[in-house]
Design a protein with these regions (language model features):
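Short hydrophobic beta-strand element within catalytic cores of glycosyltransferases
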Residues: 367-370
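Conserved donor-binding/catalytic core segment of Leloir-type glycosyltransferases
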Residues: 261-288
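Aromatic "clamp/platform" in nucleotide-sugar-dependent glycosyltransferases that forms part
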Residues: 350
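A conserved catalytic-core segment of Leloir-type glycosyltransferases
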Residues: 2-20, 26-37, 75-140
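Carbohydrate-associated surface elements
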Residues: 227, 249
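Conserved acidic donor-binding segment of nucleotide-sugar-dependent glycosyltransferases
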Residues: 382-383, 388-395, 404-409
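Nucleotide-activated donor-binding/catalytic signature segment of Leloir-type glycosyltransferases, i.e.
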Residues: 311-333
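Acceptor-binding helix/loop patch of EC 2.4 sugar-transfer enzymes
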Residues: 102-127, 167-212
């Protein structure tokens, strides 16, 4: 038997041995609504609270909706979200095929209990991503069995056929799409070489055809920036009158300067929720390699680069292992304290539909260097007043902007203070909840969506 085949069989057996059925957490009943408020079914196909912004959005938005008097029950697939008291929770069973420490695992036979399980697994075997499809089918069945318990469904970026079915069946429905995932696909393909890798990248993003098809049928879509609104209209074909803008927020009582935290000279910080080209870590690392020639600096990366991936390989190639530290799994307060130690925070993304890391750093009064990719200029504000903006994918521009801030303590303090004030005035979860609730009211009363919220 060829060694490669023996190795494949051994790895498959090991995966089977490690596989265990998903243990569902207990359902948590939501607090009842106040008079005149809505009963909301909030859907998120994966609620991971530590990786990406979707779990953060879910936790803070649902908490503030409950504070407004609404009753909110979150339906989530694994990994499960962190939710606050008063927010209901119903787990939606899934195979969790990408979980740590066994991503792309082969489930045990006992885990296959429905057609959705089989579909999700077969899509993965075909190099695709089947979670949105399978989750939408599962949650559609669950909601149909509970018709009459909810006034409105709020789906967060699943856009599978089950969501379209809910809309066809007459459920009042609001869709949140943070930015067009077509951009992720384009950037991923631009940074992929080799026929096989390009093929598998296209296969992975195969769910986009489904999402675009579903999205065009939905009557109301909320997005988080004016740039995303324009791009969703242009790239995904959603009419502008079906789109409105409600920005995300930050808890500025947690993300704030802490008097006991001491600045570390030359400390830089970047937060990257995923190890993908769109986050711009490679151009930043190239800039760091140039900056270290003349300066004593170090970089904290909040995130977990893939072993052997593009970011890890770049750190090794540029000899940056002694000044780059990666940290993951921190709490919000720990993250805020890490920001407080930094002299400069960087958001080097090639594109962002909004950017939680930008407003988290600004709320901590840390001066931000960000690119002009996507909505970042909307979020950060005028370059030179509330932050510094540079072209995306430009290491030399990053060197100049970071160096300018490191050399000018007065400018750091000025931009940090103005940035925090901008966030407090514009980007809070209370503002997000009020804007979202206004969308619910418009949908339930048959009115057009509210006007997009201004960032100025």
């Amino acid at each position: 038997m060829p060694r490669s085949l023996r190795q494949t069989i051994a790895e498959t057996r090991a995966s089977w041995a490690r596989s265990r059925a998903i243990t569902l957490p207990e359902r948590v009943a939501p607090a009842p609504p106040a008079p005149g408020k809505s009963r909301v079914a909030f859907l998120i196909y994966r609620g991971n609270p530590r990786c990406g912004g979707q779990g953060v959005y879910t936790r803070h938005l649902t908490r503030e909706l409950v504070a407004l008097g609404h009753s909110v029950e979150v339906f989530s697939g694994p990994p499960w979200p962190e939710l606050d008291d008063g927010v209901g929770f119903t787990p939606v069973r899934g195979l969790d095929l990408y979980r740590d420490p066994d991503p792309f695992r082969i489930p045990a036979r006992r885990e296959f209990t429905s057609r959705e399980d089989v579909s999700e697994f077969l899509i993965m075997l075909g190099a695709g991503f089947g979670e949105p499809y399978a989750f939408s089918r599962r949650v559609h069945k669950m909601l149909r069995a509970r018709r009459g318990e909810f006034d409105i469904v709020h789906d967060n970026q699943c856009m599978g056929p089950g969501i379209a079915a809910l809309a066809r069946e007459g459920w009042p429905l609001l869709e949140t799409l943070h930015h067009p995932i077509t951009v992720d696909r384009s950037i991923a393909l631009d940074h992929t070489t080799g026929a096989w890798k390009r093929f598998t990248t296209r296969r992975w993003f195969g769910f986009l055809r489904m999402q675009v098809r579903v999205l065009r049928t939905l009557p109301a879509v909320l997005t988080v920036s004016h740039n995303s609104k324009v791009d969703i209209n242009a790239q995904m074909g959603v009419p502008l009158e079906r789109l409105t803008v409600v920005p995300v927020g930050v808890d500025h009582e947690v993300f704030r300067p802490y008097p006991d935290v001491v600045k570390r000279p030359g400390r830089l910080m970047v937060t990257s929720s995923s190890d993908v080209p769109m986050k711009g870590l490679v151009p930043l690392l190239e800039a760091i390699a140039k900056l270290r020639v003349e300066r004593e600096i170090d970089l904290i990366v909040i995130g977990r680069p893939r072993p052997g991936g593009r970011v890890a390989s770049t750190i090794e190639r540029l000899g940056l292992g002694d000044i780059v530290t990666t940290i993951s799994g921190v709490s919000d307060e720990e993250l805020a304290r890490l920001y407080g130690e930094a002299e400069v925070a960087i958001v080097p993304s090639l594109y962002e539909g909004f950017s939680l890391p930008a407003i988290e750093a600004m709320a901590c009064a840390v001066p931000v260097v960000a690119t002009t990719g996507g909505a970042l200029p909307e979020v950060v504000g005028v370059s030179g007043e509330t932050g510094l903006l540079v072209a995306p994918n430009d290491p030399e521009a990053l060197v100049a902007a970071i160096g300018r801030l490191l050399d000018d303590a007065a400018l750091r303090a000025e931009l940090g203070a103005r940035g925090r004030q901008r966030v407090i005035e514009r980007f809070t979860w209370q503002v997000t909840a009020r804007g979202t609730a206004a969308c619910y009211d418009s949908i339930l009363q048959g009115r057009p969506l509210p006007a997009s919220m201004s960032f100025d």
